[in-house]
Structure formats: structure tokens, C-alpha cells
Regions:
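A contiguous, well-structured pocket-lining segment that forms one wall/lid of small-molecule binding clefts
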Residues: 33, 194-291, 302-309, 313-314, ...
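N-terminal beta-alpha supersecondary unit
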Residues: 2-78, 84-88, 117, 121, ...
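Short Gly/Thr/Asp-enriched flexible loops that form oxyanion-binding sites at enzyme active sites
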Residues: 84-110, 301-310
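Conserved phosphate-binding/catalytic loops in two-lobed NTP-binding clefts
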Residues: 114-115, 307-333
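Short beta-strand scaffold segments in enzyme catalytic cores
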Residues: 13-19, 138-140, 146-150
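Conserved phosphate-binding catalytic cores of ATP/NTP-utilizing and phosphoryl-transfer enzymes
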Residues: 110, 115-137
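Glycine-rich phosphate-binding loop plus the immediately following alpha-helix
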Residues: 119, 130, 153-198, 226, ...
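Glycine-rich phosphate-binding/hydrolytic loop that grips phosphoryl groups
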Residues: 121, 322-359
Length: 365
């Protein structure tokens, strides 16, 4: 069976065709995966502008779907279902994908499958590597999310922890903007960090020991927090630029390249250490047989290297998506859609977007 996946949760318009392989160990194969990025549009504004994003999705969606079907050598009558990201994300962006998918499914007489965006990221690990040894602890880390999930059976995701404030990718973008490095910040900080001294600056690591009152069901000690780190970088930069107190006017004189590289390296070391430590602490606590990292920040070179090194030291298998599957894409949505379709989880054609959709609402029944 082949399924069409559609992803428009933020600023990438993507469509993909994924098919079942008949191999239980590696159940899915990508026939096409088309992504139209809006980075050039939003770079001018220093971040994603929701109104611009949704308008660009409208311009791109038909052509992207046509390209995905053409590259996959697949006609509408060859498809078994249509899968679409229902949420979470930017509501205007989500509505474009959901509206297209519901109309297409109705016109073609195909079942519609609603997919949670983070479930797609988790299933990107299976799409890339085959079924993971379970139970597995998966870190989903991106510009909008930083969470740990326990996967005890295929298609079931239990939230273990989350960020209390900024997502890791969001912190990267904010620090990059502070340093005048442009948007998106993750790739440029990763590149500059390779030339910097990651011990040049003493930056704080937040260690939480209490439960979040907004999520009392979580223990709290596995939660993340990056706002304090971001503020520490801000104070350090202001001191360097103006030689004044943090609340005094800052100088416009640019920082030396070496200083910026040292800040990038020190910041990245603290972020990656926090991510990897909590991931493996969770793996030990829940006796996981594997760990994985998914989402846009999983493309970070230091995170990939540290994950591999820690996994080898702990003698636990580690899994990552390819770089192409790290960022938002429709192939992962199609894969998650196939999982839900086989579980009998079909959506009605009056499906609506949900910008704050909880992942636990989409557990298998």
C-alpha cells in the first residue's frame, strides 16, 4: 500500500509518497519526499512570520503534491490513503495542509489519516533505521519542542519530560540573533562552534529537581530549561560589547570572530550536554533497550557525535534520522499515517487543525 503524506505545520510545505515493504523489521520505503522551504522568506524577518508562512503554503501546496506523485510514479488511484499533520504547529499553516488533504481524500475517495507532528518525528527513526528495540526513549528536539518520550510498543508514545520554557532550537535561534548571525541560528552556531573553545565561557546548566505544577504527572527532574542559559549569554555579550552593566545601553561595535566562535561553542556544549544527559538518565530509569533523537536539532553535529559516544560507552543502541528526515518533511507524516491506518485510526472528513494537539490524544486504541 502507498500513502500520500502532507506536512505544513510551520514553514515547510512538504508532500511525500511512502509505501509498505512487507518487511516487519523495516516496514516502510520512501518513493518521494518533496520539501519547499521558506527559509529565504523568513530570514529577512529573523524568524517565522505566521501570516507569510500560511500564504506561502497556499502558493506551494498544489505544485508540491503534484511533484511528489510524479516523482513516485504514482497516480491518485494507486494510493490507499492520505495522511496529514493535524497539529501542533501554526494554526494558519496547519489549516492549509488539512484543508487540502480533506478535499483530496474526499475527491479521490480515500481514507484520511490525522497525524501528530511529533509522532511523525518519532516515526522518522523507524523510517530511517527500521523498527527500534523496545522499550526506547526518544528525544524530540526542534525549534518548537524539546521532549522525551517512552515508546513501549509501536505507535504508543508516553511523555516523560519537556522543556519548561524555550525549546532547544528556539534558544539556538535567539542566541544567533543576539550574536548577529541571522536566521535560522542552529546551523550557523553549529558551524562556528567547531572553531571555538567550548570551555572559554562559564555558562550555567539548569538542573530541575521538582515537578512542574502545570504538569504534575511528570517527575520534573528530567525536564529541560534553556531560558537561564540564554539570559547568561545575553549578559555576557552585553558586558563584552559595552563594558557596562547588563541593563545599560550596549555598544554597536561588533564582537571579534574568535569571541563569537567561543560563545557559540560554549553555548552548544551546555545545550548538548543537557540533552544527552537527560536522554540517557531516562533510558536508565525506564530500562530502555535503545535511545533515539529526532527533530530539526538532531541534525546538529555535536549532538550526533555525543549521542554516539555516550551510547557506545553505555552499550545501548542509538538511532538518528538522516539529515533529510531531521527537518520537517512529509515522509515522516506518511510513515506515521501508515502506522495509524493499520491500527484502524481513520479521521473524518470534517477534520480540523489543532495548534496545541497533545500527543497522548493519538495513542493507539
Amino acid at each position: 500500500m502507498r500513502i500520500l503524506g502532507i506536512e505544513t505545520s510551520c514553514d515547510e510545505t512538504s508532500a511525500a509518497v511512502v509505501e509498505e515493504t512487507g518487511d516487519a523489521a523495516k516496514p516502510w520505503s520512501i518513493r518521494s519526499n518533496i520539501v519547499a522551504s521558506q527559509v529565504a522568506i523568513h530570514r529577512e524577518w529573523g524568524g517565522v512570520v505566521p501570516e507569510l508562512a500560511s500564504r506561502q503554503h497556499i502558493r506551494d501546496i498544489c505544485g508540491v503534491v503534484d511533484r511528489a506523485l510524479s516523482e513516485a510514479e504514482t497516480a491518485w488511484e494507486d494510493l490507499g490513503a492520505v495522511a496529514v499533520t493535524q497539529g501542533p504547529g501554526l494554526v494558519g499553516s496547519l489549516l492549509v495542509g488539512v484543508s487540502y488533504a480533506t478535499a483530496a481524500a474526499a475527491a479521490a475517495g480515500l481514507p484520511l489519516v490525522a497525524v501528530h507532528h511529533l509522532a511523525g518525528h518519532i516515526e522518522s527513526l523507524v523510517l530511517q533505521n527500521g523498527e527500534l528495540p523496545l522499550p526506547s526513549v526518544v528525544l524530540v528536539v526542534s525549534g518548537g519542542h524539546t521532549s522525551l518520550y517512552l515508546v513501549e510498543q509501536p505507535g504508543s508514545y508516553q511523555l516523560l519530560s519537556r522543556t519548561r520554557d524555550d525549546a532547544a532550537g528556539e534558544a539556538y535561534d535567539k542566541v544567533a540573533k543576539l550574536l548577529g548571525l541571522g536566521y535560522p541560528g542552529g546551523p550557523v552556531i553549529d558551524r562556528l562552534a567547531k572553531t571555538g573553545d567550548d570551555r572559554a565561557i562559564a555558562l550555567p546548566t539548569t538542573r530541575l529537581t521538582h515537578a512542574d505544577r502545570n504538569a504534575p504527572e511528570l517527575k520534573g527532574d528530567l525536564d529541560f530549561s534553556f531560558s537561564g542559559l540564554k539570559t547568561a549569554v545575553l549578559r555576557h555579550v552585553r558586558d563584552l560589547e559595552s563594558g557596562a552593566a547588563p541593563d545599560e545601553p550596549r555598544s554597536r561595535a561588533p564582537l571579534p570572530d574568535k569571541t563569537i566562535a567561543d560563545i557559540a561553542a560554549s553555548f552548544q556544549r551546555v545545550v548538548v550536554t543537557a540533552l544527552v544527559e537527560r536522554l540517557f538518565n531516562a533510558a536508565r530509569r525506564y530500562q530502555a533497550r535503545s535511545v533515539g533523537v529526532a527533530g530539526g536539532v538532531s541534525a546538529n553535529s555535536r549532538l550526533r557525535a555525543d549521542l554516539k559516544e555516550r551510547g557506545e560507552r553505555r552499550e545501548i543502541p542509538t538511532f538518528l534520522p538522516s539529515l533529510a528526515l531531521s527537518t520537517d518533511n512529509a515522509a515522516m507524516i506518511a510513515a506515521a499515517g501508515l502506522r495509524r491506518f493499520r491500527a484502524g485510526q481513520i479521521a473524518s472528513l470534517d477534520l480540523n487543525a489543532d495548534a496545541a494537539l497533545p500527543l497522548h490524544d493519538q495513542r493507539p486504541t
